[in-house]
Amino acid sequence: MSVLKVIEVLGNSTVSFEDAVKNVIKEASKSVKNIESVYVNHMYVDVKNNAITEYRVNTKVTFKITHE
């Protein structure tokens, strides 16, 4: 039997939404192991002078709890 845990993680990028999600995985994996999935709750953009300046994502990261 496996037990999974879900945490909320916010990410951002100046490139794209995809890059923002990749940043979430990269940063979360520094403290969380066994990431199994990332669910994107919301996507936002920051705009200045009618141009997108930053892509933001609100995600739920699911990972398996292991006992070592």
Residue ranges and their predicted role:
Residues 1-2, 68:
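Compositionally biased, disordered extreme N-termini, encompassing classical targeting presequences
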Residues 4, 38, 56-58:
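Structural motif
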Residues 9-11, 43, 57-63:
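A structural signal for short, well-ordered beta-strand segments
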Residues 14-16, 45, 62, 66-68:
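Generic "edge-of-domain/loop-turn" microfeature
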Residues 24-25, 47-52:
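Noncatalytic linker/hinge segments flanking ATPase motor cores
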Residues 38-47:
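Short, conserved loop-to-beta-strand elements that form functional interface hotspots
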